[in-house]
Amino acid sequence: MAKILQTQAITADTFRTNADTRFSESAFGEQVVAQELAFVQAAPVYDLLPSNFRAYTATGGTAGAENKMFKASTGTSAGGYGAIQSFRSLNYKPGEGAIAKFTALFESNAASSWQGAGLVNLGDELSFGYNGTSFGIWYRHNGLAEVRTITVTGAAGGSENLTLTLNGTAETVPLTSGTVEHNAYEIADYINASVAGWDADQLDDTVIISASSDGAKAGTYSFSSATATGTIAQNKAGVTKTSEFVAEADWNGEAVSIDPTKGNVFKIRYQYLGFGAIYFDIEDPSTGRFKTVHTIQYANDHTIPSLGNPSMKFGIYAVNLTNTSNLIVRSGSCGLFVDGQRVSTRNPRGVVNSQSVGTSFTNILTLRNRRTYNGYINQVEIQPLLLDISSESGSKNFEIEVRSTTDTGVEQNFTNAGTNLVSDVDKSSVTVTSGRLLATAVVAPQTNTIIDLKALGI
């Protein structure tokens, strides 16, 4: 018996009617497909915290890796917490969506506690977790760190102690004779090594300090020393992030039945652009497919952007407020992506320096991505492109090393690399041996060597 094959002419209107309406079209009616670009991918399968992750603990809390999972716990004291964050953020680009995929389980819950797993930065959070005994979604946004600038206006005439008061707490900072830049380095070095709750960057004769948490830090700030003089000015006032918790019973999407004490697969997607929608997805255990369980429908309803900074890190945390039972959050792995290619949108910049060197490794150039930018915590990435080294020696080879480090262990004097840039540069002639070796090359007399830094993925 012959079978009749029915056909239908496919037109643009037919496609729009019959196809998945979530497909995007170009200005010419062509289907647009976005390719995910990974920024963070991690799985602690060797029970070690990856080197590009950081752990935070207090009052008996712990953070690390166990049973091939990230683990954060509160311990059994009120105020205890454990947290883990990726060092790198997904680098949001306007017009490209951002995605987090991860697994998580929450072993238990208790009143007067917080737990979460998802996207975080100092002032924002998009996560699944617990508010006390209620499972749901955390949406925290638009928090700011206190940022101030200490300017050394007069150098110390000898060895003396600076009384530096930060947010009402007096610190005793040893100073020695030298330049204002030298004293600024001493102050920044002391703060980073000895003052909890603050980070510091020396820049010429100034020290830019930023609080390591959001919220107002409106106490007393002062600079008092025997001969050294200085001022402290506020760049940005700290603001406590707005916290919103949407309990599972109040979600507005598809229903998915899960047990949060078991490992589940989660996904968080956001358009940003300032006012785009934010989607929270959970894998349906019965089908292995994601369902959107809740959407923050932000457009046409607000007058300020949904996030203070859309470049976010992966993180898990467990926090005891007044609770004293041990709460544990685990995650098997995570991936952070943007929907699109990595394309530079700014003109490249360069710096140059000449240095006489001997038989010890001597700094020629040090580049730094600063902690703050225009008074805000900096989440922008710098991408080194190339290093061109030439030798004026007529008879000797010399070796060049490229190292990555957060602290050379020697005094350096950073200056601006250019106007309105996040990068600083140091050209001090100091001996440097610390840090992770990234590349090395030998430069022959009267020649030059080029190292492709972009290929190293620094």
What does each model-identified segment do?
Residues 154, 253-262, 269-271, 449-458:
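Exposed beta-sheet edge/beta-hairpin loop segments within beta-rich domains
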